[in-house]
Amino acid sequence: MELLKEAIRKRGSVLSSGVLKVDQFLNHQVDTNLMSAIGEEFARLFADEHVTKVVTIESSGIAPSFMCAHSLQVPLIFARKKKSVTMDKENVYSSRVYSFTKKEYSEVTVSKDWLCPGDRVLIIDDFLANGQAATGLTQIVEEAGATVAGIGIVIEKSFQDGRALLEGKGYRIESLARISSLEGNKVQFVEESAHFAYNKS
């Protein structure tokens, strides 16, 4: 998605060979016009999957997920990292997930009231790195007896093993921007890497 790639190039900051900072438009300050376009693109990509619910993890996944759910005209559910006092702890689906950015585990939960066996669920997240967050959400969806209709990722770090992990389990993945490298404080996209390799040969 060129609009997203342009935002990454102009407004993203490479902090290390493994960390891209995008808090100017995605996970702190939110560019609502860009999120709207991202939501519409996910809705277009998964239009044939008969999605009934969109699921994400709080909090950075909420903005793109909301726009996607709005475009699909279906409810959005966000898994909580901390149990609410209003949530019956005996009436939840839960999974333990590891955050690549925060270097810590979280127990994420979804109320059993909102996921049903007949649901076809689209999982949306802001980043795909090692695939642990998305895997945790697939476990919750499947524990509910629902079906994972697909996984939509805003920014994928293709140099990490998240895609291989999820595709190995048979899930459909659509990423709007795939980054092949952050080496040298420069963002390199998968398509650009392939083009460079072709030209070199």
From Swiss-Prot:
Signal peptide: none annotated. Disulfide bonds: none annotated. Keywords: Cytoplasm, Glycosyltransferase, Purine salvage, Transferase. Its main location: cytoplasm. The keyword Cytoplasm applies. One of its GO terms (cellular component) is cytoplasm. 5-phospho-alpha-D-ribose 1-diphosphate binds at residues 129-133. It catalyses: XMP + diphosphate = xanthine + 5-phospho-alpha-D-ribose 1-diphosphate. One of its GO terms (molecular function) is xanthine phosphoribosyltransferase activity. It holds the Pfam family Pribosyltran. InterPro entries: PRibTrfase_dom, PRTase-like, Pur/Pyrimidine_PRTase, Xanthine_PRibTrfase. It comes from the Bacteria. One of its GO terms (biological process) is purine ribonucleoside salvage. The keyword Cytoplasm applies. Belongs to the purine/pyrimidine phosphoribosyltransferase family. Xpt subfamily. Homodimer. This is Xanthine phosphoribosyltransferase. The lineage of its organism: Bacteria, Bacillati, Bacillota, Bacilli, Bacillales.
